[in-house]
């Protein structure tokens, strides 16, 4: 279920403040954040934000296509190792 239109999009205030300061000064630093639920705003385009995945911070470069999505959508929290191949033992059980 999506967020109510009357409430508006959520973004961590500190994150938005730091992005606006960087835009004003013309800086391009990697910002660390734990706020996976923050919505990507147009001011963030061109910046790299390191989003926490539960173990480490994964850098995400923000492009125009990402605006309106959440930061957490672009960082996976689980490692998929694939399904086990059919072994001789499992095929013999049938």
Curated annotation (Swiss-Prot):
Gene3D superfamilies: 30s Ribosomal Protein S19, Chain A. GO terms for biological process: ribosomal small subunit assembly; translation. Keywords: Ribonucleoprotein, Ribosomal protein, RNA-binding, rRNA-binding. InterPro entries: Ribosomal_uS19 (IPR002222), Ribosomal_uS19_bac-type (IPR005732), Ribosomal_uS19_CS (IPR020934), Ribosomal_uS19_SF (IPR023575). One of its GO terms (molecular function) is structural constituent of ribosome. It comes from the Bacteria. One of its GO terms (cellular component) is cytoplasm. Protein S19 forms a complex with S13 that binds strongly to the 16S ribosomal RNA. HAMAP family: Ribosomal_uS19. PANTHER family: RIBOSOMAL PROTEIN S19P FAMILY MEMBER (PTHR11880), SMALL RIBOSOMAL SUBUNIT PROTEIN US19M (PTHR11880:SF8). Belongs to the universal ribosomal protein uS19 family. This is Small ribosomal subunit protein uS19. The gene is rpsS.
């Amino acid at each position: 279920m999506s967020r109510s239109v009357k409430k508006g999009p959520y973004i961590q205030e500190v994150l938005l403040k730091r992005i606006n300061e960087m835009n004003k000064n013309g800086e391009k630093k990697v910002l660390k954040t734990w706020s996976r639920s923050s919505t990507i705003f147009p001011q963030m385009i061109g910046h790299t934000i390191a989003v926490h995945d539960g173990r480490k911070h994964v850098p995400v470069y923000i492009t125009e296509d990402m605006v309106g999505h959440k930061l957490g959508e672009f960082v996976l929290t689980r490692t998929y190792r694939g399904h086990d191949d059919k072994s001789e033992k499992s095929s013999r059980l049938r």
